[in-house]
UniProtKB/Swiss-Prot annotation:
Source organism of the structure: Bifidobacterium longum subsp. infantis (strain ATCC 15697 / DSM 20088 / JCM 1222 / NCTC 11817 / S12)
Keyword field: ATP synthesis, ATP-binding, Cell membrane, CF(1), Hydrogen ion transport, Ion transport, Membrane, Nucleotide-binding, Translocase, Transport
Name of this protein: ATP synthase subunit beta
Family under the similarity heading: Belongs to the ATPase alpha/beta chains family.
Main location as per UniProt: membrane
Entry-linked SUPFAM superfamilies: C-terminal domain of alpha and beta subunits of F1 ATP synthase, N-terminal domain of alpha and beta subunits of F1 ATP synthase, P-loop containing nucleoside triphosphate hydrolases
Record Gene3D superfamilies: 2.40.10.170, Bovine Mitochondrial F1-atpase, Atp Synthase Beta Chain, Chain D, domain 3, P-loop containing nucleotide triphosphate hydrolases
Lipid bilayer topology: Peripheral membrane protein
GO CC annotations, alphabetized: plasma membrane; proton-transporting ATP synthase complex
Pfam families in UniProt: ATP-synt_ab, ATP-synt_ab_N, ATP-synt_VA_C
GO molecular function: ATP binding; ATP hydrolysis activity; proton-transporting ATP synthase activity, rotational mechanism
Class of enzymatic activity (EC top level): translocase
Compartments in which it is found: Cell membrane
């Protein structure tokens, strides 16, 4: 594995001996075999270039994956190999793929090799430092041993599925339930309340979605606080496999050199596993369970172990997870779950009620929802809220049959409190202000716990359900109820 800085060896040239799709065999002089993970460069002549201004030559990067004997390496191409022929000259760069790091990455979109994709024609960008994407995780004695909660100011997350500083969070949800808005809001809050930056890795998803995300982030004003790296579904499997490492390397620089708290988004972590399976098959490895690569756990671990808190600052990761055929025992999601500290599940049913963020409070989990980490008051409040919501869920079938009036007084009270809790779990977002016209709100965790404890204790039993909708903390609730009373009096 490479360290922060890697000195390039004397360049050595080889020649292509075999081309099979994106797998390339290259022969080098004996004694000059490139190291595993070294980046090789080869130029393809584009014989089909007929339009004026169309590139006549294309340089592609190969990454060394295997040594075959004393003089041949097997590589994976990061770009299409159309036009590559046997005998083509290949140069060894002497170092792994290296990417720009530092402030130059903010507000820019990169490919896996660190090339800027959204550079303006008149823009001059100076890259002063590059880091290799293959790096060791922090040493054991550099890790932060204390488990801390990462306060987001979002009530439903802080109360029921608290995030771990330097932890890994799985984000589940279908199309249209608010994943993108939640991602944008987290980027905004990290910059605003934690003074940190965000890095986004788009792995194997639709190019249109990536383009929409960039446009929406620019509109929301969070693009300048974010570095984005994309390897979408039309890219080579080698590219999709390395994009998370490129993004993570940029995040590590912010953490280790600039001492910032970083939020790393990976969308979608399943596509990373899928790309690893494709590369493994191309390299001729024997498949393992359900056709996945035999080194699935090792590949996942090499990525996830680098996402952590050091004694300086942290990288907190939010990873969108696709579960194939909703089978949670599939090796890909099952391997990912072993690394997660919390799961946030977005529900279409909750979104259909107009409650955002549409986090399912009963399905979402966190390993630090424990008195040892969040305190007894937080733990007790979360359990009481979940118990009320669970009882309300059980009563829905009965209510559908006989109506709410036939319930016992205790169950009626539970249902009324549950409805208020559901509404109060919603919250206005800063990035949605221009669409909703309602200002965003940040609610400290202590205030969240106090507010929900009061609801569970029945302090607000006389306050109508409508007063709990679209507000932030206790002060907002009491102000809205006061205004409603004035309107009713008028």
């Amino acid at each position: 594995m490479a360290d922060n800085q890697t000195t390039a060896a004397e360049p050595t040239n080889g020649r292509v001996t075999r081309v099979q799709g994106s797998v390339i065999d290259v022969e080098f002089p004996v004694g000059h075999l490139p190291d595993i993970y070294n980046a090789l460069k080869v130029t393809i002549v584009n014989t089909g270039a007929k339009e004026e201004g169309e590139a006549k030559e294309t340089e592609i990067t190969l990454e060394v994956e295997q040594h075959l004997g004393d003089s041949t390496v097997r590589c994976v191409a990061l770009k299409p190999t159309d036009g590559l022929v046997r005998g083509a000259s290949v140069s060894d760069t002497g170092v792994p793929i290296s990417v720009p790091v530092g402030d130059v990455t903010k507000g820019h979109v990169f490919d896996v090799s660190g090339n800027i994709l959204n550079k303006k024609p008149d823009e001059t960008i100076t890259v002063s430092e590059r880091w290799p994407i293959h790096r060791n995780p922090p040493a054991f004695d550099q890790l932060e041993s204390k488990t801390q909660m990462f306060e987001t100011g979002i009530k439903v997350i802080d109360l029921l599925t608290p995030y771990v500083q330097g932890g890994k969070i799985g984000l589940f949800g279908g199309a249209g339930v608010g994943k993108t808005v939640l991602i944008q809001e987290m980027i905004q809050r990290v910059a605003q309340n934690h003074g940190g930056v965000s890095v986004f890795a788009g792995v194997g998803e639709r190019t249109r979605e990536g383009n929409d995300l960039i446009g929406e982030m620019a509109e929301a004003g969070v693009l300048e606080k974010t570095a984005l790296v994309f390897g979408q579904m039309d890219e080579q499997p080698g590219t999709r496999l390395r994009v998370p490492l490129t993004a993570l390397t940029m995040a590590e620089y912010f953490r280790d050199v600039q001492n910032q708290d970083v939020l790393l988004f990976i969308d979608n972590i399943f596509r990373f596993t899928q790309a690893g399976s494709e590369v493994s098959t191309l390299l001729g490895r024997m498949p393992s369970a359900v056709g996945y690569q035999p080194n699935l756990a090792d590949e996942m671990g090499s990525l996830q172990e680098r996402i952590t808190s050091t004694r300086g600052h942290s990288i907190t990761s939010l990873q969108a997870i696709y579960v194939p055929a909703d089978d949670y025992t599939d090796p890909a999601p099952a391997t990912t779950f072993a690394h997660l500290d919390a799961t946030t599940e977005l529900s279409r049913d909750i979104a259909s009620k107009g409650i955002y963020p549409a986090v399912d409070p009963l399905s979402s989990t966190s390993r630090i929802l424990d008195p040892r980490y969040v305190g007894q008051a937080h733990y007790d409040c979360a359990n009481r809220v979940k118990a009320i919501l669970q009882r309300n869920k059980e009563l829905q079938d009965i209510i559908a049959l006989i109506g709410i009036d036939e319930l016992s007084e205790e169950d009626k009270t539970t249902v009324n409190r549950a409805r208020k809790i559901e509404q109060f779990l919603g919250q206005n977002f800063y990035v949605a202000e221009k669409f909703t016209g309602r200002p965003g709100s940040y609610v400290p965790a202590d205030e969240t716990i106090e507010a929900f404890t009061r609801i569970c204790d029945g302090v607000y039993d006389d306050v109508p359900e409508q007063a709990f909708s679209g507000i932030g903390g206790i002060d907002d609730l009491e102000e809205k109820w006061h205004n409603m009373q004035k309107e009713l009096g008028a």
